[in-house]
């Protein structure tokens, strides 16, 4: 606590700051998970509210690792995956997954996936030989603010003399949002498809904007 400069900076977990109850903290979720391993899970609306109100930001892990060596975020993520496997999903996340399956993106599609790179003169890894891929991801492909990050990354790589390319419209979603939402099977399928694409294109090095 000696590192906290004031009360206004004491809260790091969004959900425990909002609900002010230990179950909504990282430690509280670990306790719930440990109890579930011993006695099984009795799903209730409040339990699912606790599970899905975690932003998986990792602040709990940073706080705990200041004083002890333990993994906090992974068990919380695994418990969410178990909820999904048991059919206890969240409607908003169900809609996101449905959109991913339908459009290939975890965020709304606003145009061509590779449009963010227009005018930058970047290589297309499907046509131009290179072993390094700059992977933009869903947000940097379709959201204006994130597109600026991808564009800046491309310019920096160019100035550094890095020989790289992009997948453009052929780029696939990483499935990271599906993983964070607890949909492990969807994530693994996206990973499988990406691995196949990288192998076919001869990619050996990935530079990722997201995730």
Describe the predicted segments one by one.
Residues 31-208:
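Iron-sulfur-cluster electron-transfer modules
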